[in-house]
Amino acid sequence: MSTSVFNRRWAALLLEALTRHGVRHICIAPGSRSTPLTLAAAANPSLVCHTHFDERGLGHLALGLAKASTEPVAVIVTSGTAVANLYPALIEAGLTGERLILLTADRPPELIDCGANQAIRQQGLFASHPTLSVNLPRPTPDISARWLVSTLDSAMAQLQHGALHINCPFAEPLYGGDEQQYADWSASLGDWWQDCHPWLRQTCYPPSLYQPPAQQADWFFWRQKRGVVIAGRMGAQEGRQLTAWAAMLGWPLIGDVLSQTGQPLPCADLWLAHPRAQETLAQAQMVLQFGSSLTSKRLLQWQTACQPQEYWLVDSAPGRLDPANHRGRRIICPVGEWLSRHPAQRRTPWATELAAYSESAQAQVIETLAGQFSEAAVAHQLAELLPDNGQLFVGNSLIVRLIDALGQLPAGYPVYSNRGASGIDGLLSTAAGVQRATAKPTLAIVGDLSALYDLNALALLRQSSAPMVLLVINNNGGQIFSLLPTPEAERQRFYCMPQDVNFEHAAVMFSLGYARPNSWPQLRELAHQCWLRGGTTLIEVQVPPSQGAETLQQLVQQVTLIPQVAP
Protein backbone atom coordinates (compact mmCIF):
# COMPACT_ATOMS: atom_id res chain seq x y z
CA MET A 1 0.00 0.00 0.00
CA SER A 2 1.18 3.51 -0.80
CA THR A 3 2.50 5.81 1.92
CA SER A 4 2.32 8.78 -0.45
CA VAL A 5 -1.38 8.25 -1.15
CA PHE A 6 -2.29 7.95 2.51
CA ASN A 7 -0.24 11.06 3.30
CA ARG A 8 -2.42 12.94 0.83
CA ARG A 9 -5.67 11.53 2.23
CA TRP A 10 -4.57 12.55 5.72
CA ALA A 11 -3.67 16.04 4.50
CA ALA A 12 -6.92 16.39 2.55
CA LEU A 13 -8.92 15.65 5.68
CA LEU A 14 -6.80 18.08 7.68
CA LEU A 15 -7.37 20.93 5.21
CA GLU A 16 -11.08 20.20 4.87
CA ALA A 17 -11.46 20.26 8.65
CA LEU A 18 -9.89 23.73 8.76
CA THR A 19 -12.31 25.09 6.16
CA ARG A 20 -15.19 24.07 8.45
CA HIS A 21 -13.83 26.63 10.93
CA GLY A 22 -13.76 29.55 8.53
CA VAL A 23 -10.32 29.16 6.95
CA ARG A 24 -10.52 30.56 3.40
CA HIS A 25 -6.97 31.80 2.77
CA ILE A 26 -3.89 29.59 2.87
CA CYS A 27 -0.31 30.74 2.27
CA ILE A 28 2.13 28.22 0.81
CA ALA A 29 5.92 28.18 0.51
CA PRO A 30 7.72 25.70 -1.77
CA GLY A 31 9.02 22.47 -0.28
CA SER A 32 9.03 18.73 -0.79
CA ARG A 33 8.18 17.47 2.69
CA SER A 34 5.04 19.63 2.66
CA THR A 35 3.84 18.10 -0.63
CA PRO A 36 0.81 16.31 0.90
CA LEU A 37 -0.43 19.55 2.44
CA THR A 38 0.27 21.64 -0.65
CA LEU A 39 -1.53 19.28 -3.02
CA ALA A 40 -4.48 19.02 -0.64
CA ALA A 41 -4.75 22.80 -0.45
CA ALA A 42 -4.56 23.16 -4.22
CA ALA A 43 -7.35 20.59 -4.66
CA ASN A 44 -9.71 22.11 -2.09
CA PRO A 45 -12.22 24.44 -3.81
CA SER A 46 -12.94 26.29 -0.56
CA LEU A 47 -9.38 27.60 -0.27
CA VAL A 48 -7.70 30.59 -1.90
CA CYS A 49 -4.00 29.74 -2.25
CA HIS A 50 -1.30 32.40 -1.92
CA THR A 51 2.36 31.59 -2.58
CA HIS A 52 5.68 33.15 -1.66
CA PHE A 53 9.23 31.82 -1.76
CA ASP A 54 10.31 33.38 1.56
CA GLU A 55 8.79 31.81 4.67
CA ARG A 56 9.34 34.88 6.84
CA GLY A 57 7.44 37.01 4.34
CA LEU A 58 4.86 34.25 3.93
CA GLY A 59 4.07 34.34 7.64
CA HIS A 60 3.58 38.10 7.49
CA LEU A 61 1.44 37.77 4.35
CA ALA A 62 -0.83 35.48 6.35
CA LEU A 63 -0.76 37.96 9.23
CA GLY A 64 -1.98 40.76 6.95
CA LEU A 65 -4.71 38.56 5.50
CA ALA A 66 -5.87 37.70 9.01
CA LYS A 67 -5.78 41.34 10.15
CA ALA A 68 -7.97 42.66 7.37
CA SER A 69 -10.31 39.68 6.98
CA THR A 70 -10.65 38.98 10.75
CA GLU A 71 -10.65 35.30 9.75
CA PRO A 72 -8.23 32.49 10.61
CA VAL A 73 -5.54 32.05 7.95
CA ALA A 74 -3.42 28.93 7.40
CA VAL A 75 0.24 28.65 6.41
CA ILE A 76 2.08 25.67 4.90
CA VAL A 77 5.88 25.35 5.07
CA THR A 78 8.35 22.52 4.69
CA SER A 79 10.60 21.17 7.44
CA GLY A 80 13.78 22.66 8.88
CA THR A 81 14.67 26.34 9.09
CA ALA A 82 11.62 27.13 6.96
CA VAL A 83 9.62 26.61 10.15
CA ALA A 84 11.79 28.96 12.22
CA ASN A 85 11.20 31.75 9.70
CA LEU A 86 7.56 31.90 10.83
CA TYR A 87 8.58 33.02 14.31
CA PRO A 88 8.25 36.83 13.85
CA ALA A 89 4.74 36.64 12.40
CA LEU A 90 3.69 34.15 15.06
CA ILE A 91 4.92 36.46 17.83
CA GLU A 92 3.08 39.44 16.33
CA ALA A 93 -0.14 37.44 16.02
CA GLY A 94 0.11 36.41 19.65
CA LEU A 95 0.33 40.05 20.71
CA THR A 96 -2.30 41.52 18.40
CA GLY A 97 -4.73 38.61 18.24
CA GLU A 98 -4.82 37.51 14.60
CA ARG A 99 -5.58 33.81 14.23
CA LEU A 100 -2.90 31.93 12.29
CA ILE A 101 -2.76 28.16 11.76
CA LEU A 102 0.84 27.14 11.08
CA LEU A 103 1.03 23.78 9.30
CA THR A 104 4.68 22.77 9.50
CA ALA A 105 5.70 19.65 7.61
CA ASP A 106 8.23 17.53 9.48
CA ARG A 107 10.41 14.47 9.11
CA PRO A 108 9.05 11.39 10.90
CA PRO A 109 10.43 10.77 14.43
CA GLU A 110 13.03 8.21 13.34
CA LEU A 111 14.79 10.88 11.24
CA ILE A 112 15.22 13.41 14.07
CA ASP A 113 18.58 13.74 15.87
CA CYS A 114 20.34 11.24 13.63
CA GLY A 115 21.94 13.45 11.01
CA ALA A 116 19.10 13.30 8.47
CA ASN A 117 18.94 16.21 6.07
CA GLN A 118 16.64 19.17 6.81
CA ALA A 119 15.50 17.58 10.06
CA ILE A 120 15.37 19.70 13.22
CA ARG A 121 13.47 19.47 16.50
CA GLN A 122 10.24 21.17 15.48
CA GLN A 123 8.04 20.07 18.35
CA GLY A 124 7.98 22.90 20.87
CA LEU A 125 10.15 25.08 18.62
CA PHE A 126 7.95 28.12 19.23
CA ALA A 127 7.94 27.69 23.03
CA SER A 128 5.09 29.60 24.69
CA HIS A 129 4.28 31.89 21.75
CA PRO A 130 1.54 29.82 20.08
CA THR A 131 -1.80 29.89 21.84
CA LEU A 132 -2.12 26.17 21.11
CA SER A 133 0.13 23.44 19.71
CA VAL A 134 -0.81 20.08 18.20
CA ASN A 135 1.86 17.49 17.40
CA LEU A 136 0.26 15.06 14.98
CA PRO A 137 1.56 11.50 14.63
CA ARG A 138 2.96 10.13 11.40
CA PRO A 139 -0.04 9.37 9.14
CA THR A 140 -1.18 5.76 9.35
CA PRO A 141 -4.50 4.04 8.58
CA ASP A 142 -4.30 2.53 12.05
CA ILE A 143 -5.44 5.95 13.34
CA SER A 144 -9.07 6.64 12.50
CA ALA A 145 -10.22 9.59 10.45
CA ARG A 146 -12.53 10.43 13.34
CA TRP A 147 -9.56 10.93 15.65
CA LEU A 148 -7.84 13.32 13.26
CA VAL A 149 -10.89 15.45 12.52
CA SER A 150 -11.93 15.56 16.19
CA THR A 151 -8.44 16.61 17.25
CA LEU A 152 -8.45 19.46 14.74
CA ASP A 153 -11.99 20.54 15.60
CA SER A 154 -11.12 20.70 19.28
CA ALA A 155 -8.04 22.83 18.66
CA MET A 156 -9.83 25.22 16.31
CA ALA A 157 -12.74 25.63 18.71
CA GLN A 158 -10.29 26.81 21.36
CA LEU A 159 -8.45 29.23 19.07
CA GLN A 160 -9.83 32.68 19.84
CA HIS A 161 -6.61 34.69 19.78
CA GLY A 162 -3.12 34.14 18.34
CA ALA A 163 -1.59 31.16 16.57
CA LEU A 164 -2.17 27.42 16.44
CA HIS A 165 0.92 25.37 15.55
CA ILE A 166 0.15 21.99 13.96
CA ASN A 167 3.31 19.95 13.36
CA CYS A 168 2.77 17.39 10.60
CA PRO A 169 5.36 14.63 10.11
CA PHE A 170 5.27 12.80 6.78
CA ALA A 171 7.29 9.75 5.79
CA GLU A 172 8.49 9.10 2.25
CA PRO A 173 7.54 8.46 -0.46
CA LEU A 174 5.74 11.76 -0.99
CA TYR A 175 4.82 11.41 -4.67
CA GLY A 176 2.89 9.06 -6.92
CA GLY A 177 0.71 6.06 -6.07
CA ASP A 178 -2.80 4.84 -6.85
CA GLU A 179 -5.21 7.60 -5.84
CA GLN A 180 -8.00 5.06 -5.23
CA GLN A 181 -6.19 3.51 -2.29
CA TYR A 182 -7.43 4.16 1.26
CA ALA A 183 -10.77 5.49 0.01
CA ASP A 184 -12.49 3.53 2.77
CA TRP A 185 -10.48 5.42 5.43
CA SER A 186 -11.87 8.76 4.20
CA ALA A 187 -15.32 7.29 3.60
CA SER A 188 -15.59 6.31 7.26
CA LEU A 189 -16.75 9.88 7.91
CA GLY A 190 -19.87 9.23 5.84
CA ASP A 191 -21.85 12.25 4.66
CA TRP A 192 -19.60 14.66 6.59
CA TRP A 193 -17.81 15.28 3.30
CA GLN A 194 -21.02 16.71 1.84
CA ASP A 195 -21.71 18.76 4.97
CA CYS A 196 -20.29 22.19 5.79
CA HIS A 197 -19.96 21.88 9.58
CA PRO A 198 -17.20 20.60 11.87
CA TRP A 199 -17.33 16.94 12.83
CA LEU A 200 -17.07 17.89 16.49
CA ARG A 201 -19.01 21.06 17.31
CA GLN A 202 -17.22 21.97 20.49
CA THR A 203 -18.49 25.01 22.36
CA CYS A 204 -16.17 26.99 24.61
CA TYR A 205 -17.64 28.88 27.54
CA PRO A 206 -15.08 31.24 29.01
CA PRO A 207 -17.30 34.07 30.30
CA SER A 208 -15.63 36.87 28.34
CA LEU A 209 -16.22 35.03 25.07
CA TYR A 210 -19.75 33.63 25.27
CA GLN A 211 -21.61 36.19 27.38
CA PRO A 212 -22.31 39.77 26.41
CA PRO A 213 -20.20 42.03 28.60
CA ALA A 214 -21.80 42.56 31.96
CA GLN A 215 -22.61 46.17 32.72
CA GLN A 216 -20.41 47.70 35.36
CA ALA A 217 -22.88 48.25 38.19
CA ASP A 218 -21.44 51.64 39.11
CA TRP A 219 -21.21 52.99 35.56
CA PHE A 220 -24.14 55.37 36.05
CA PHE A 221 -22.21 56.87 38.95
CA TRP A 222 -18.87 57.24 37.14
CA ARG A 223 -20.29 58.66 33.93
CA GLN A 224 -21.27 61.78 35.88
CA LYS A 225 -17.65 62.42 36.86
CA ARG A 226 -14.75 64.07 35.06
CA GLY A 227 -13.31 61.44 32.75
CA VAL A 228 -10.66 61.10 30.06
CA VAL A 229 -10.85 58.58 27.21
CA ILE A 230 -7.69 57.06 25.72
CA ALA A 231 -8.19 55.33 22.38
CA GLY A 232 -5.60 52.78 21.28
CA ARG A 233 -5.76 50.24 18.47
CA MET A 234 -9.30 49.29 17.42
CA GLY A 235 -11.48 48.74 14.37
CA ALA A 236 -12.97 51.44 12.16
CA GLN A 237 -16.55 51.02 13.38
CA GLU A 238 -15.39 50.96 17.00
CA GLY A 239 -13.42 54.17 16.42
CA ARG A 240 -16.45 56.02 15.08
CA GLN A 241 -18.65 54.69 17.87
CA LEU A 242 -16.18 55.70 20.57
CA THR A 243 -15.81 59.23 19.19
CA ALA A 244 -19.56 59.86 19.37
CA TRP A 245 -19.80 58.24 22.81
CA ALA A 246 -17.01 60.36 24.33
CA ALA A 247 -18.40 63.54 22.77
CA MET A 248 -21.81 62.93 24.35
CA LEU A 249 -20.17 62.40 27.75
CA GLY A 250 -18.20 65.62 27.37
CA TRP A 251 -14.97 63.73 28.07
CA PRO A 252 -11.80 64.57 26.13
CA LEU A 253 -10.71 61.74 23.81
CA ILE A 254 -6.99 61.31 23.17
CA GLY A 255 -6.76 59.13 20.07
CA ASP A 256 -3.81 57.10 18.84
CA VAL A 257 -3.01 57.01 15.12
CA LEU A 258 -4.41 53.45 15.08
CA SER A 259 -7.64 54.32 16.90
CA GLN A 260 -9.58 55.35 13.78
CA THR A 261 -11.40 57.90 15.93
CA GLY A 262 -10.43 60.86 13.75
CA GLN A 263 -8.24 62.08 16.64
CA PRO A 264 -10.62 64.85 17.77
CA LEU A 265 -7.74 66.42 19.74
CA PRO A 266 -4.96 66.15 17.13
CA CYS A 267 -1.25 66.60 17.80
CA ALA A 268 -1.63 65.06 21.27
CA ASP A 269 2.03 64.04 21.31
CA LEU A 270 2.82 67.77 21.21
CA TRP A 271 0.23 69.42 23.44
CA LEU A 272 0.54 66.75 26.14
CA ALA A 273 3.96 68.25 26.83
CA HIS A 274 2.34 71.54 27.88
CA PRO A 275 2.31 71.88 31.70
CA ARG A 276 -1.15 73.50 31.76
CA ALA A 277 -2.64 70.71 29.67
CA GLN A 278 -1.21 68.21 32.13
CA GLU A 279 -2.72 70.16 35.02
CA THR A 280 -6.13 70.03 33.35
CA LEU A 281 -5.90 66.29 32.77
CA ALA A 282 -4.85 65.77 36.39
CA GLN A 283 -8.38 66.81 37.39
CA ALA A 284 -9.80 63.65 35.81
CA GLN A 285 -11.51 61.39 38.30
CA MET A 286 -11.63 58.51 35.85
CA VAL A 287 -9.57 57.31 32.89
CA LEU A 288 -11.12 54.86 30.44
CA GLN A 289 -8.69 53.28 27.98
CA PHE A 290 -10.01 51.39 24.96
CA GLY A 291 -7.49 49.33 23.01
CA SER A 292 -3.75 49.07 23.52
CA SER A 293 -0.49 49.66 21.58
CA LEU A 294 -0.22 53.38 22.26
CA THR A 295 2.32 55.17 20.03
CA SER A 296 2.83 58.65 21.49
CA LYS A 297 5.71 59.06 23.93
CA ARG A 298 3.97 61.93 25.73
CA LEU A 299 0.70 60.00 25.96
CA LEU A 300 2.50 56.99 27.41
CA GLN A 301 4.24 59.25 29.93
CA TRP A 302 0.93 60.80 31.00
CA GLN A 303 -0.81 57.42 31.06
CA THR A 304 1.92 56.11 33.35
CA ALA A 305 1.85 59.10 35.68
CA CYS A 306 -1.91 59.70 35.93
CA GLN A 307 -3.60 58.86 39.23
CA PRO A 308 -7.37 58.89 38.73
CA GLN A 309 -9.75 57.40 41.24
CA GLU A 310 -10.65 54.72 38.67
CA TYR A 311 -8.72 53.33 35.68
CA TRP A 312 -10.58 50.94 33.39
CA LEU A 313 -9.04 49.26 30.34
CA VAL A 314 -11.38 47.69 27.77
CA ASP A 315 -10.06 45.42 25.01
CA SER A 316 -11.12 42.10 23.53
CA ALA A 317 -7.58 40.72 23.74
CA PRO A 318 -6.56 38.77 26.85
CA GLY A 319 -3.76 39.93 29.13
CA ARG A 320 -3.11 42.99 31.23
CA LEU A 321 -2.11 45.44 28.43
CA ASP A 322 -1.12 48.13 30.95
CA PRO A 323 2.65 48.52 31.48
CA ALA A 324 1.90 51.16 34.15
CA ASN A 325 0.01 48.56 36.23
CA HIS A 326 -2.79 50.87 37.34
CA ARG A 327 -5.14 49.85 40.08
CA GLY A 328 -8.52 49.45 38.45
CA ARG A 329 -10.44 47.14 36.13
CA ARG A 330 -9.33 45.11 33.12
CA ILE A 331 -12.46 44.38 31.08
CA ILE A 332 -12.00 41.77 28.35
CA CYS A 333 -14.65 42.29 25.69
CA PRO A 334 -15.07 43.98 22.29
CA VAL A 335 -15.02 47.77 22.49
CA GLY A 336 -18.25 48.20 20.52
CA GLU A 337 -20.19 45.78 22.71
CA TRP A 338 -19.00 47.46 25.89
CA LEU A 339 -20.00 50.90 24.61
CA SER A 340 -23.45 49.64 23.65
CA ARG A 341 -24.05 48.33 27.17
CA HIS A 342 -22.69 51.46 28.88
CA PRO A 343 -24.61 54.38 27.42
CA ALA A 344 -23.28 57.90 27.61
CA GLN A 345 -25.20 60.68 29.31
CA ARG A 346 -25.05 64.05 27.58
CA ARG A 347 -22.97 66.40 29.67
CA THR A 348 -21.15 69.69 29.19
CA PRO A 349 -17.46 69.18 28.30
CA TRP A 350 -15.33 69.75 31.39
CA ALA A 351 -11.89 70.26 29.78
CA THR A 352 -12.54 72.63 26.89
CA GLU A 353 -9.10 74.23 27.19
CA LEU A 354 -7.56 71.02 25.82
CA ALA A 355 -9.17 71.76 22.46
CA ALA A 356 -7.51 75.16 22.51
CA TYR A 357 -4.10 73.63 23.21
CA SER A 358 -4.67 71.11 20.43
CA GLU A 359 -5.64 73.86 17.97
CA SER A 360 -2.60 75.91 18.95
CA ALA A 361 -0.33 72.90 18.51
CA GLN A 362 -1.81 72.17 15.10
CA ALA A 363 -1.35 75.81 14.08
CA GLN A 364 2.28 75.61 15.17
CA VAL A 365 2.76 72.50 13.03
CA ILE A 366 1.24 74.21 9.99
CA GLU A 367 3.44 77.27 10.47
CA THR A 368 6.63 75.27 10.99
CA LEU A 369 6.08 72.95 8.02
CA ALA A 370 4.83 75.61 5.60
CA GLY A 371 6.57 75.20 2.26
CA GLN A 372 8.51 72.13 3.36
CA PHE A 373 8.70 68.87 1.46
CA SER A 374 9.94 66.74 4.29
CA GLU A 375 9.28 63.60 6.29
CA ALA A 376 7.33 65.61 8.87
CA ALA A 377 5.34 67.42 6.18
CA VAL A 378 4.32 64.15 4.52
CA ALA A 379 3.22 62.78 7.91
CA HIS A 380 1.22 65.94 8.61
CA GLN A 381 -0.59 65.92 5.26
CA LEU A 382 -0.87 62.16 4.78
CA ALA A 383 -4.68 62.22 4.86
CA GLU A 384 -4.64 64.08 1.52
CA LEU A 385 -3.03 61.06 -0.15
CA LEU A 386 -5.57 58.48 1.03
CA PRO A 387 -7.73 56.81 -1.65
CA ASP A 388 -11.50 56.95 -1.41
CA ASN A 389 -12.97 53.76 0.08
CA GLY A 390 -9.44 52.55 0.69
CA GLN A 391 -7.18 51.68 3.57
CA LEU A 392 -3.85 52.66 5.11
CA PHE A 393 -0.99 50.48 6.31
CA VAL A 394 1.47 52.29 8.58
CA GLY A 395 5.00 51.05 9.18
CA ASN A 396 6.92 51.20 12.43
CA SER A 397 9.84 53.18 13.81
CA LEU A 398 9.88 56.95 13.13
CA ILE A 399 7.14 57.31 10.53
CA VAL A 400 4.29 56.03 12.73
CA ARG A 401 5.35 58.44 15.48
CA LEU A 402 5.39 61.39 13.10
CA ILE A 403 1.94 60.56 11.73
CA ASP A 404 0.63 60.13 15.27
CA ALA A 405 2.12 63.44 16.42
CA LEU A 406 1.54 65.64 13.39
CA GLY A 407 -1.25 64.13 11.31
CA GLN A 408 -4.99 63.67 11.62
CA LEU A 409 -6.58 60.72 9.85
CA PRO A 410 -10.30 60.56 8.98
CA ALA A 411 -12.60 58.97 11.53
CA GLY A 412 -13.48 55.41 10.59
CA TYR A 413 -10.81 55.15 7.88
CA PRO A 414 -9.26 51.65 8.10
CA VAL A 415 -5.70 51.71 9.45
CA TYR A 416 -3.52 48.63 9.87
CA SER A 417 -0.08 48.10 11.36
CA ASN A 418 2.17 45.67 13.21
CA ARG A 419 2.28 47.42 16.59
CA GLY A 420 2.35 44.33 18.78
CA ALA A 421 6.08 43.68 18.88
CA SER A 422 6.61 46.76 16.65
CA GLY A 423 9.32 45.18 14.51
CA ILE A 424 10.29 46.45 11.08
CA ASP A 425 10.50 42.92 9.65
CA GLY A 426 7.75 41.79 7.30
CA LEU A 427 5.97 45.12 6.90
CA LEU A 428 5.67 44.97 3.11
CA SER A 429 4.47 41.37 3.29
CA THR A 430 1.85 42.29 5.90
CA ALA A 431 0.65 45.20 3.76
CA ALA A 432 0.33 42.82 0.80
CA GLY A 433 -1.84 40.52 2.91
CA VAL A 434 -4.06 43.40 4.03
CA GLN A 435 -4.60 44.43 0.42
CA ARG A 436 -5.37 40.88 -0.75
CA ALA A 437 -7.91 40.34 2.01
CA THR A 438 -10.03 43.35 1.10
CA ALA A 439 -9.16 44.16 -2.55
CA LYS A 440 -9.34 47.84 -1.57
CA PRO A 441 -7.06 50.63 -2.81
CA THR A 442 -4.19 50.64 -0.32
CA LEU A 443 -1.60 53.19 0.74
CA ALA A 444 1.33 51.69 2.65
CA ILE A 445 3.97 53.95 4.17
CA VAL A 446 7.30 52.68 5.56
CA GLY A 447 10.87 53.83 6.06
CA ASP A 448 13.84 52.88 3.90
CA LEU A 449 15.29 50.31 6.30
CA SER A 450 11.88 48.67 6.68
CA ALA A 451 11.61 48.43 2.90
CA LEU A 452 15.11 46.96 2.62
CA TYR A 453 14.38 44.45 5.38
CA ASP A 454 11.45 42.99 3.43
CA LEU A 455 12.57 43.87 -0.09
CA ASN A 456 11.71 40.54 -1.69
CA ALA A 457 8.08 41.10 -0.65
CA LEU A 458 7.86 43.46 -3.63
CA ALA A 459 7.19 40.22 -5.51
CA LEU A 460 3.89 39.99 -3.60
CA LEU A 461 2.89 43.51 -4.61
CA ARG A 462 2.94 42.61 -8.31
CA GLN A 463 -0.30 40.70 -7.78
CA SER A 464 -2.37 43.63 -6.53
CA SER A 465 -6.08 43.33 -7.28
CA ALA A 466 -6.66 47.04 -6.57
CA PRO A 467 -4.49 50.15 -6.85
CA MET A 468 -1.65 50.17 -4.34
CA VAL A 469 0.95 52.79 -3.48
CA LEU A 470 4.01 51.89 -1.44
CA LEU A 471 5.36 55.16 -0.07
CA VAL A 472 8.98 54.75 1.05
CA ILE A 473 10.28 57.62 3.19
CA ASN A 474 14.02 57.42 2.57
CA ASN A 475 15.82 59.24 5.38
CA ASN A 476 18.90 57.08 4.87
CA GLY A 477 18.82 54.86 7.92
CA GLY A 478 17.04 54.22 11.17
CA GLN A 479 16.53 57.85 12.13
CA ILE A 480 14.34 57.01 15.09
CA PHE A 481 17.65 56.73 16.92
CA SER A 482 18.07 60.47 16.37
CA LEU A 483 15.13 60.86 18.79
CA LEU A 484 16.94 58.86 21.45
CA PRO A 485 19.97 59.84 23.55
CA THR A 486 22.24 57.53 21.57
CA PRO A 487 25.96 58.44 21.68
CA GLU A 488 26.52 60.94 18.89
CA ALA A 489 29.92 59.57 17.89
CA GLU A 490 28.51 56.08 17.36
CA ARG A 491 25.00 57.01 16.21
CA GLN A 492 25.42 56.69 12.46
CA ARG A 493 27.60 53.58 12.36
CA PHE A 494 25.97 51.50 15.09
CA TYR A 495 22.37 52.77 15.28
CA CYS A 496 21.12 54.57 12.15
CA MET A 497 23.24 52.48 9.75
CA PRO A 498 22.69 54.54 6.57
CA GLN A 499 22.71 52.44 3.38
CA ASP A 500 22.85 55.18 0.72
CA VAL A 501 20.39 53.46 -1.61
CA ASN A 502 17.44 54.38 -3.77
CA PHE A 503 14.64 52.05 -4.72
CA GLU A 504 14.26 52.67 -8.44
CA HIS A 505 16.07 49.50 -9.52
CA ALA A 506 14.18 47.43 -6.94
CA ALA A 507 10.89 48.59 -8.43
CA VAL A 508 12.12 47.77 -11.93
CA MET A 509 13.31 44.31 -10.82
CA PHE A 510 9.79 43.44 -9.67
CA SER A 511 8.00 45.24 -12.54
CA LEU A 512 6.42 47.88 -10.31
CA GLY A 513 5.77 51.48 -11.18
CA TYR A 514 8.22 53.97 -9.69
CA ALA A 515 8.33 57.70 -9.03
CA ARG A 516 10.45 60.08 -6.97
CA PRO A 517 8.61 63.40 -6.50
CA ASN A 518 10.39 66.59 -5.51
CA SER A 519 7.48 68.55 -4.05
CA TRP A 520 4.26 68.05 -2.16
CA PRO A 521 1.99 69.00 -5.11
CA GLN A 522 3.89 66.52 -7.27
CA LEU A 523 3.50 63.75 -4.67
CA ARG A 524 -0.20 64.47 -4.26
CA GLU A 525 -0.79 64.37 -8.02
CA LEU A 526 1.24 61.17 -8.39
CA ALA A 527 -0.83 59.44 -5.73
CA HIS A 528 -4.05 60.63 -7.36
CA GLN A 529 -2.95 59.24 -10.72
CA CYS A 530 -2.02 55.92 -9.11
CA TRP A 531 -5.53 55.52 -7.71
CA LEU A 532 -6.95 56.10 -11.18
CA ARG A 533 -4.42 53.98 -13.09
CA GLY A 534 -4.30 50.87 -10.92
CA GLY A 535 -1.44 48.49 -10.33
CA THR A 536 1.29 49.00 -7.74
CA THR A 537 3.58 52.01 -7.66
CA LEU A 538 6.57 52.51 -5.39
CA ILE A 539 6.89 56.21 -4.60
CA GLU A 540 10.17 57.16 -2.96
CA VAL A 541 10.47 60.40 -0.98
CA GLN A 542 14.09 61.24 -0.24
CA VAL A 543 14.50 63.51 2.77
CA PRO A 544 17.40 64.83 4.88
CA PRO A 545 18.40 62.10 7.37
CA SER A 546 17.65 63.57 10.79
CA GLN A 547 15.22 66.33 9.80
CA GLY A 548 12.08 64.45 10.81
CA ALA A 549 13.33 63.66 14.30
CA GLU A 550 14.69 67.17 14.77
CA THR A 551 11.41 68.74 13.62
CA LEU A 552 9.41 66.67 16.10
CA GLN A 553 11.73 67.64 18.96
CA GLN A 554 11.55 71.29 17.92
CA LEU A 555 7.76 71.28 17.80
CA VAL A 556 7.47 69.68 21.23
CA GLN A 557 9.60 72.49 22.65
CA GLN A 558 7.62 75.20 20.83
CA VAL A 559 4.26 73.88 21.97
CA THR A 560 5.32 73.88 25.63
CA LEU A 561 5.69 77.67 25.28
CA ILE A 562 2.12 78.27 24.08
CA PRO A 563 0.47 80.83 26.40
CA GLN A 564 -1.85 79.47 29.04
CA VAL A 565 -5.47 79.11 27.96
CA ALA A 566 -8.17 80.35 30.31
CA PRO A 567 -10.51 77.53 31.45
UniProtKB/Swiss-Prot annotation:
Its EC number is 2.2.1.9. It is an enzyme of class 2 (transferase). Pfam families: TPP_enzyme_C (PF02775), TPP_enzyme_M_2 (PF16582), TPP_enzyme_N (PF02776). It catalyses: isochorismate + 2-oxoglutarate + H(+) = 5-enolpyruvoyl-6-hydroxy-2-succinyl-cyclohex-3-ene-1-carboxylate + CO2. InterPro entries: MenaQ_synth_MenD, MenD_middle, THDP-binding, Thiamin_PyroP_enz_TPP-bd_dom, TPP_enzyme_TPP-bd. GO terms for molecular function: 2-succinyl-5-enolpyruvyl-6-hydroxy-3-cyclohexene-1-carboxylic-acid synthase activity; magnesium ion binding; manganese ion binding; thiamine pyrophosphate binding. Its cofactor is Mg(2+); Mn(2+); thiamine diphosphate. Keywords: Magnesium, Manganese, Menaquinone biosynthesis, Metal-binding, Thiamine pyrophosphate, Transferase. SUPFAM superfamilies: Thiamin diphosphate-binding fold (THDP-binding). One of its GO terms (biological process) is menaquinone biosynthetic process. Coiled coil: none annotated. Pathway: Quinol/quinone metabolism; 1,4-dihydroxy-2-naphthoate biosynthesis; 1,4-dihydroxy-2-naphthoate from chorismate: step 2/7; Quinol/quinone metabolism; menaquinone biosynthesis. Disulfide bonds: none annotated. It comes from the Bacteria. Binds 1 thiamine pyrophosphate per subunit. Catalyzes the thiamine diphosphate-dependent decarboxylation of 2-oxoglutarate and the subsequent addition of the resulting succinic semialdehyde-thiamine pyrophosphate anion to isochorismate to yield 2-succinyl-5-enolpyruvyl-6-hydroxy-3-cyclohexene-1-carboxylate (SEPHCHC). Belongs to the TPP enzyme family. MenD subfamily. Homodimer. This is 2-succinyl-5-enolpyruvyl-6-hydroxy-3-cyclohexene-1-carboxylate synthase. The gene is menD.
